[in-house]
């Protein structure tokens, strides 16, 4: 597929400029939002610190687990630091992440996390990932040893500054991606944002990539429960005439969430892009579903475009893509349209070379 090109001044701005080491998030649209102007398929480059933050149950661990699984699928090493101590191995397997004793740890303090990053031995030919989920759960020795604790959070903020300063220097020229998750807390200040991420300003300052994830709606499915599926229970119940003729009961269930990821800071590519992400319980990131919906919305179509066919029903389009193994072709289609949109925006904003005063 040909990637759009644009001219800037007297030089030629050619997309993309490929990174040496890059890992996918598992979401085509999120990959493109992160670095679509720098790499044809986008993705998260190694050698940086990234942070993803959001409310509880918004999908932070899902995104991090997917990143880890993508890295492992390409032969990369992963170390999952779990200060919260609640990562379930079966949950990790849903996303394809393989968690064993040697690549899982439960650090207590910020200093423990720094030591783990420095002792992590990154390979030469693959993209490796170090994950900490979440920073908010880390403590300091002052907090644990003192009766009063670290009330103002000053010691934790200081330790995080040291952690980030040393970490950024270590990984700057490596093939290691350091990814943190963080929570959103209510801000006690009467000014500015009503929410904040705990730990001070260290991570927002040093992180090259910050992602905010928000759930926009629950994915709800409805099922008609036919009396026939009651099996042997039905044989023990005496049904009246009206019961026999009554319609099947409809039961609804929340099966996932639709979220939007917003890039609030990026030194990788253009910031403030957004990407829709679908997360299905028991399945993981639904890239096919998100891509189909995005194409339909962006192109203003009345039907779902499934590579070479159109479908009225959403599930029929998904089934066709999976049966024909068209997942890659669908990703390429989405990438082509996305690059076309970016090309048009860049063409519109072209300016003559800047004059120095």
Predicted regions and their residues:
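N-terminal cationic and glycine-rich segments that engage phosphates or anionic surfaces
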Residues: 143, 186-190, 307
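Flexible beta-alpha connector loops of hexameric P-loop NTPases
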Residues: 100-109, 143-159, 191-195
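The Walker A/P-loop phosphate-binding site
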Residues: 1-102, 118-122
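Phosphate-binding/switch region of NTP-binding enzymes
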Residues: 153-294
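Loop/turn-to-beta-strand initiation segments
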Residues: 75-77, 126-129, 173-180
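Conserved ATPase-coupling elements of RecA-like P-loop NTPase cores
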Residues: 138-147, 171
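Terminal-proximal interaction/regulatory segments of ATP-powered molecular machines
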Residues: 304-357
């Amino acid at each position: 597929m040909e990637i759009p090109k644009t001219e800037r001044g007297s030089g030629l701005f050619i997309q993309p400029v490929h990174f040496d080491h890059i890992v996918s998030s598992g979401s085509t649209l999120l990959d493109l939002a992160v670095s679509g102007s720098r790499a044809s398929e986008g993705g998260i480059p190694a050698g940086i610190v990234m942070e993803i933050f959001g409310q509880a149950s918004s999908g932070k661990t899902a995104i991090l687990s997917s990143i880890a699984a993508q890295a492992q699928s390409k032969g990369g090493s992963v170390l999952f630091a779990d200060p919260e101590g609640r990562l379930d191995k079966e949950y990790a397997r849903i996303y394809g992440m393989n968690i064993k004793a040697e690549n899982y740890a439960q650090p207590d303090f910020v200093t423990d996390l720094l030591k783990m990053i420095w002792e992590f031995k990154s390979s030469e030919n693959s993209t490796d990932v170090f994950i900490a989920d979440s920073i908010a759960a880390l403590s300091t020795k002052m907090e644990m040893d003192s009766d009063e604790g670290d009330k103002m959070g000053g010691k934790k903020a200081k330790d995080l500054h040291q952690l980030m300063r040393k970490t950024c220097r270590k990984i700057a020229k490596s093939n290691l991606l350091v990814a943190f998750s963080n929570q959103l807390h209510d801000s006690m200040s009467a000014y500015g944002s009503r929410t904040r991420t705990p730990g001070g300003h260290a991570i927002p300052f040093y992180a090259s990539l910050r992602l905010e994830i928000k759930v926009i709606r629950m994915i709800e499915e409805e099922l008609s429960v036919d009396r026939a599926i009651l099996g042997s229970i039905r044989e023990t119940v005496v049904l009246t005439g009206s019961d026999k003729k009554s319609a099947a009961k409809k039961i609804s269930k929340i099966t996932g969430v639709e979220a939007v990821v917003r890039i609030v800071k990026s030194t990788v590519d253009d910031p403030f892009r957004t990407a829709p992400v679908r997360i299905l319980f028991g399945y993981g990131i639904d890239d096919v579903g998100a891509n189909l919906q995005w194409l339909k919305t962006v192109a203003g179509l009345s039907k779902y475009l499934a590579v070479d066919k159109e479908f009225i029903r959403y599930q029929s389009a998904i089934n066709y893509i999976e049966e024909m193994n068209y997942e890659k072709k669908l990703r390429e289609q989405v990438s082509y349209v996305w690059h076309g949109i970016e090309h048009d925006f860049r063409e519109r904003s072209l300016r003559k070379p800047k004059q120095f005063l």
